[in-house]
């Protein structure tokens, strides 16, 4: 006979023990603390909940069922479905018409129908203020005082026997007669009220100190900066005049009959060559010319691009050169030159001798004529250039007749005095300088700084 073990009975839970022993007061302290959530873990949660909020998760010493209500899944409310298709129209209620109803519908009620049963409504009348009338009827009379004026009679007539002389222009005849009323309280005579209004002039006068209107200063047009004198450009001065008209002749040997336009010029050098001008070596591009003014001169400039090195991709590497030549200087102010007249304005014939020949000359004896020297008639001066008439002796044969002609007067120029060196009145004596003291120039006070030698190789340091 097999031995049967007794069935194991389940122990009561802490909640069941708390319900039976709480009334009698025999509950163990751990059961009371567990049921009333007063254990050490519950106290830590209470103290930590002062700074941290766990959202009512029911964290405690229970069985982990999520508290009394358990765990509830978090769900979001579904969106309402949007109906598709046309919406239904609300029904229209139509009144039915019976066979005995009238088919004519009157829009306006007949005004001839009198409702005898209804009474007409009369609105109540409220009482207003009372108007008091007086029995005495006295007309209103205004007290108007009449102002007395003195009457003055004035008559003006024109007397034909007396006429006042006119100053500027003749005055028309005036004949008038009438009465002028003047007030006893005022001393001026006026027929109506007059308002004094100052006259405004519309003539605008201006001066240099106070202009009448403001003329806006036009904004200066910003000129492009050429940058011809930057550090990136090599400055080369060209003295060949062909640089102005045909610069391509300085780079390559072209056709001299062809003259290109003033545009950028490009050159291709397939082989090594020497240009006509060594300054234009390896020039592959010459930009268009630019005329500028610098330091009082007119300068003709062109920028050139050298093609000293080419890469495999075909790009050339080279410096930029500024070729320039000075055309002419710019004078600050034009020189004033006094022009001398070619013919003298005043003619002085006092010291002049003209050559006149008798219109009816007689026979000339050749054997008796003398040939004087020209020095006795021609007078010359070394330091004066005054022109005048000179008498020239003529030794004519007997068969040639001389006719008198006009006098030729040359312009007179001012005489230049001769240069005489000034001889000093005092005798010239030699000057001897002797002494041991001297003054050093201020620029030599500071000694020159000696440059420190910097070693570039390790061999210099070792030495």
From Swiss-Prot:
Motif Nuclear localization signal, chain ranges: 1-12, 446-454
Main location: virion
Post-translational modification: Highly phosphorylated.
GO biological process: microtubule-dependent intracellular transport of viral material towards nucleus; symbiont entry into host cell; viral penetration into host nucleus
Keywords from the named record: Capsid protein, Cytoplasmic inwards viral transport, Disulfide bond, DNA-binding, Host endosome, Host Golgi apparatus, Host nucleus, Host-virus interaction, Late protein, Microtubular inwards viral transport, Phosphoprotein, Viral penetration into host nucleus, Virion, Virus entry into host cell
Alphabetical list of InterPro entries matching this protein: Late_L2
UniProt-annotated location(s): Virion; Host nucleus; Host early endosome; Host Golgi apparatus
Function, as annotated: Minor protein of the capsid that localizes along the inner surface of the virion, within the central cavities beneath the L1 pentamers. Plays a role in capsid stabilization through interaction with the major capsid protein L1. Once the virion enters the host cell, L2 escorts the genomic DNA into the nucleus by promoting escape from the endosomal compartments and traffic through the host Golgi network.
Stated family: Belongs to the papillomaviridae L2 protein family.
Protein name: Minor capsid protein L2
């Amino acid at each position: 006979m097999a031995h049967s073990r007794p069935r194991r009975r389940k122990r009561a839970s802490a909640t069941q023990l708390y319900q039976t022993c709480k009334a009698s007061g025999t509950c163990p302290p751990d059961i009371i603390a567990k049921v009333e959530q007063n254990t050490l873990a519950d106290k830590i949660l209470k103290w930590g909940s002062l700074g941290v909020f766990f959202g009512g998760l029911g964290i405690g010493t229970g069985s982990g069922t999520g508290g009394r209500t358990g765990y509830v899944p978090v769900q979001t409310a579904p969106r309402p479905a949007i109906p598709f298709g046309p919406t239904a129209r609300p029904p229209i209620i139509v009144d039915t018409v019976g066979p005995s109803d009238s088919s004519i519908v009157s829009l306006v009620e007949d005004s001839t129908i009198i409702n005898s049963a209804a009474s007409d409504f009369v609105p109540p009348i409220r009482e207003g203020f009372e108007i008091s009338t007086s029995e005495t009827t006295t007309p209103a009379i205004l007290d108007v005082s009449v102002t007395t004026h003195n009457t003055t009679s004035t008559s003006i007539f024109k007397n034909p026997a007396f006429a006042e002389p006119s100053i500027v222009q003749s005055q028309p005849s005036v004949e008038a007669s009438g009465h002028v009323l003047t007030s006893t309280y005022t001393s001026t005579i006026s027929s109506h009220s007059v308002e004094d209004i100052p006259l405004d002039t519309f003539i605008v006068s201006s001066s240099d100190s106070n202009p009448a209107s403001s003329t806006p200063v036009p904004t200066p047009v910003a000129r492009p900066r050429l940058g011809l004198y930057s550090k990136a450009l090599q400055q080369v001065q060209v003295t060949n005049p062909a640089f102005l008209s045909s610069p391509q002749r300085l780079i390559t040997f072209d056709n001299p009959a062809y003259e290109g336009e003033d545009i950028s010029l490009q050159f291709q050098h397939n082989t090594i060559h020497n240009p006509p001008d060594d300054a234009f070596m390896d020039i592959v591009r010459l930009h268009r010319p630019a005329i500028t003014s610098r330091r009082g001169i007119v300068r003709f400039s062109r920028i050139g691009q050298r093609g000293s090195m080419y890469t495999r991709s075909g790009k050339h590497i080279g410096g930029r050169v500024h070729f320039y030549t000075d055309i002419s200087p710019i004078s600050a102010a034009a020189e004033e030159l006094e022009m001398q007249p070619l013919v003298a304005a005043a003619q002085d014939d006092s010291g002049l001798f003209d050559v006149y020949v008798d219109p009816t000359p007689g026979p000339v004896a050749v054997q008796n004529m003398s040939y004087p020297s020209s020095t006795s008639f021609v007078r010359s001066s070394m330091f004066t250039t005054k022109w005048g008439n000179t008498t020239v002796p003529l030794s004519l044969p007997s068969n040639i007749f001389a006719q008198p002609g006009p006098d030729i007067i040359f312009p007179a120029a001012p005489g230049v005095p001769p240069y005489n060196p000034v001889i000093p009145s005092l005798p010239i004596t030699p000057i001897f300088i002797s002494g041991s003291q001297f003054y050093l120039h201020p620029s030599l006070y500071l000694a020159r700084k000696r440059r420190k030698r910097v070693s570039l190789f390790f061999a210099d340091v070792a030495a």
